[in-house]
Amino acid sequence: MTKKYRKQQKNKKDWDSLCRVLAEVQERDDPQVASLALKQTLTEVYRRLAGAHVVYPTPKRISLEETLRIMRAFLEQGSGGDRLLALASALFSVVGSRFKLFREVRRSNITASDASTGLMADLECLNQAGEVVVVVEVKDRVLTITQLRTKMADIREKQVSEIFFVAHQGVADADKEEIGRQVVHEFVSGHNVYITDLFALGRTALSLLGEPGRRDFVQEVGRQLDAYRSDITHRRSWAQLLASV
């Protein structure tokens, strides 16, 4: 890359900057300098992509089965739980809004711990008075008895009686009986614990919401991905799936 191609470039200012960087890397002839320059370049590319605007082409009509299909396809690629959390948050938000159950559904970024955000779980659903009435813990892996007990210990202090565990991969086989006993124990103590997966919950909720509610849901997923700055690959994937409907 040399300045002899400068006349062919539309953005001559950035071309000159690129030439200067590459010239310095070549002149220094140091692998460490080259590595640092590459890392900085990739970091900047990632930063710009992260801020890129993605258009979500909401379909005019969408059936229950099509909604579930794109949800499944969206979760096929691993995301450390980010995609699952976006779907779950969108579902509870739309259900809460449409049925006037919740004034607001609070959540944080996937990388933030509940302790650091002050939330009891991944999602907090607030009633019209601003009180937390439902909490939702979203698990992209199997739910264990240790995780259940640890989370319930935190929730008991806040006196919330309705608790959902959305366990995408179900319950750990070795813990099924113990988890069942723990759920019964929590009920006696005044807590209703519901262990489900997103698709069992989604099939019922999205049926009750009807077609207008399903359109709201797929739109809300895009808003969740944007609002919590999900990776560009996740946002583009959702946009592509909507375009396939």
PLM feature spans:
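A short mid-domain helix/strand-loop element embedded in enzyme catalytic domains
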Residues: 43-73, 81-93, 98
